[in-house]
From Swiss-Prot:
One of its GO terms (molecular function) is iron ion binding. Its main location: plastid. HAMAP family: PSII_PsbF (MF_00643). The gene is psbF. It comes from Mesostigma viride. This is Cytochrome b559 subunit beta.
Amino acid sequence: MAAEKTIQYPIFTVRWLSVHALAVPTVFFLGAISAMQFIQR
């Protein structure tokens, strides 16, 4: 986005961490739930 990488760097890291912290467990939980459903049936 911006060429300045002095104060924007921590914001990008925080946003990256928040996005991954929300996306990774969601995908993992969806996969686990779907696998459990298929195994039970």
